Structure formats: structure tokens, C-alpha cells
Amino acid sequence: MKKVTVDDFSSPENMHDVIGFYKKLTEHQEPLIRLDDYYGLGPAWVALRHDDVVTILKNPRFLKDVRKFTPLQDKKDSIDDSTSASKLFEWMMNMPNMLTVDPPDHTRLRRLASKAFTPRMIENLRPRIQQITNELLDSVEGKRNMDLVADFSFPLPIIVISEMLGIPPLDQKRFRDWTDKLIKAAMDPSQGAVVMETLKEFIDYIKKMLVEKRNHPDDDVMSALLQAHEQEDKLSENELLSTIWLLITAGHETTAHLISNGVLALLKHPEQMRLLRDNPSLLPSAVEELLRYAGPVMIGGRFAGEDIIMHGKMIPKGEMVLFSLVAANIDSQKFSYPEGLDITREENEHLTFGKGIHHCLGAPLARMEAHIAFGTLLQRFPDLRLAIESEQLVYNNSTLRSLKSLPVIF
């Protein structure tokens, strides 16, 4: 197998057979790969094994805080600070949120944000999520066809997180436009200016909303965050803006792709789709298996907080240490028949939501949305099938496993 480059992890060609690509990668590469360059930010390491990924996720020697260990800080002379990735790192250094910092800041920020994601609050959303799902499917039922991405998998989580935050319905489409623009620009080193322009538009909108919430507080997450105090330690202005930005983007982008990827996986495994359609009680295990098999987040990352030796290789302090969630989720040492889809799989320690202190805060909400989306879709449209050949589907050039569209008929 040829030397691996960063483009291999996001090329649309490999997206057509993600499992096959990572299976070949794990069979022909060492468990820790070194990339010569990661989007203009210098060299990086990529861990492929489940156990190694768990170590990186949970061991405090691997750090998140880009303010401490970003290449922009340590290697200013050798890094092009005009690239899209550099601009994104620069923004993250100035706009910290719980995803980009370590304790004690992480502990404080997560505690404040978690007040919006208590089990009771998530469970209280169930009727509304079901209602939104029904309304979206009602709107396409008469046509007997839809683009599952545009008509269903994207609108559902956008509406849910927008209502949680108290964002007007007419503004919700902006979020998809901004996140689409950001993701595309971030993959192109020449688009640094576009990254910064898009982030500015996004943050300016949040600032405008915060002014309205200060003047007219409501029973929503944004109003609650404005009032948030923890041991007299208030969210700073930048922390507040970045936390809301994170909730908006993480609250819809990944769930949308989970739903569309999951439906495609079922369509490509008709025996599994029939089994789920005829046995709705399998929905909990089906959701976990689709998270493992078709999860949208393919790559995550940390920084080495000190010189670290893994598999006999020295990772210098400050270098990026990436990990492949896809490879970890098909590790044959952890899963039986890992490259197969089995919605009855019982032991399923997938890493799609991460591990440790950065475990996805919105995991219960994403699970609920997926459970309702898959179950209702198969109940309403039992003859659901692809409208085109799967080879004709187009994937985004992204580190997220994401379809541009998914035409289906029913």
C-alpha cells in the first residue's frame, strides 16, 4: 500500500467504501502512522487500534488545549498562517469552548453546558422530536420520493437544537449554510480568508441573538447560558459565544450525517433493514450498531503534552496525535465480524461518542433523534429504497463521512 497522506482520509473516492479503506489501512500499515503534513500544520500521528484510541482519549498526557500545544504557537516560522487550518486554529485559541480546552477550564465549561442536557430535559424533548419527524415525513409523503439529506436528516436536528437555543425558525437555514461553507473551506488550504469570514458572520449572528436574549430572556438554553454562574465564575464573553457556536454546529451536523449514513447502510443491507422494520424492539441495538458502522466523525485529535512513546515510536511534545474512530470501530481484536453490519450485535464498545472527560455531551440527544428517525422512517415508508445506484452518490470532501444528497423513493 502506498504511503498514506492526509488527503486519503477525506477523499470522496474512499468514502464510497469507508470500511474497506480502513480495513486495508489497518492490515497494511503499522498501528501508528506518521503523516508528513496535516493541512499545512506540520507532521501528525494517526492511531488506528481501538485500545490505542481509548488511551489517547482518556490519558491526561494527551491534551486538547490548542492554546498550549498548537503548531501555531511552537512553530510559527515553519507554518503558513494564511491557510484555512491555521486560521481555524487561530480562532480556536481566541474562542475557547469545552471541546478545545483541558481541566480546569473544561470542567467549568462542561458543567455549565451540561445543565441543558440533563436526562430529564432530553426525555422531555421526545414528543417534540417525534412531532418534527412526523411533520417532515408528512411533507414528502405525497411525492413518494425525497432527498433524505435535504428533506429529513438535516432539518430534524437543526430544528431541535434551534428550538433548544431559542433561535427563530427563519434563521435555521443559515446554520447549514455556514457549517457547509466552513467544512468545505477548512479542507482547502487556500480558503483561510473564507474560514474567518464565515466564522465572523456566525459569531455576529450569535451576538445579535444574545442582545435579544438579554433584553427578553426566555426559557431556552441561550438565555440560561447568559445567566450561567458556577461558584461565582461566569462564562467570559468569548466562552459564551464559542459555547453557543459549538452547540449549534455539533448539535446538528453530526446527527444529520448519522441519520443519512445510517439509512444508506440499511439500504445497502436489505436483510438488516427488513429485520429492523419487522422488529422495532431492535432499535436500541440498531442505533448503536449504526453509530459503530456508519458514524460521521472519522478523525479526532489531541496534542502530546510531553514526549510520549507509543509502539516504540517517540511522539515529541506538542505534536498532533490524531486517531481514527472508523479504524477503532472495526478493530478485529475488539469486534467479531467488524466489517459487517449486525443490528443484533450485543457487545458494542464503539468509540463514536469518544471516551473520558470529552465524551460527547449530546450523545443522549443524538441517540434519541436517531432512534425516532430510523423507527418512524421504516414504519411510515416500509418500501424505502435508493432512487439511484449507490455508486452514483456523491460525498463531501470532508473529515466527516457526509453525503451531499441521498435520493430515495418509497
Swiss-Prot record:
This protein's name: Cytochrome P450 CYP107DY1
Bilayer-crossing regions: none
Pfam family membership, one: p450
Family matches, as Gene3D superfamilies: Cytochrome P450
Coiled coil regions, renumbered to chain: none
Residues reported to bind substrate: T249, E253
Catalytic activity as recorded in UniProt: mevastatin + 2 reduced [2Fe-2S]-[ferredoxin] + O2 + 2 H(+) = pravastatin lactone + 2 oxidized [2Fe-2S]-[ferredoxin] + H2O
Highest rank taxon of the organism: Bacteria
GO molecular function, one term: oxidoreductase activity, acting on paired donors, with incorporation or reduction of molecular oxygen
Biotechnology: Could be a valuable biocatalyst used in the industrial field for an efficient biotransformation of mevastatin.
InterPro entries membership: Cyt_P450 (IPR001128), Cyt_P450_B (IPR002397), Cyt_P450_CS (IPR017972), Cyt_P450_sf (IPR036396)
Its job: Cytochrome P450 whose physiological substrate is unknown. In vitro, is able to catalyze the selective hydroxylation of mevastatin to pravastatin, the widely used therapeutic agent for hypercholesterolemia.
PANTHER family in UniProt: CYTOCHROME P450 YJIB-RELATED, P450, PUTATIVE (EUROFUNG)-RELATED
Ligand binding (heme): H106, R110, R302, H358, C360
Recorded family membership: Belongs to the cytochrome P450 family.
Keyword annotations: Heme, Iron, Metal-binding, Monooxygenase, Oxidoreductase, Plasmid
EC numbers for this chain: 1.14.-.-
Cofactor section: heme
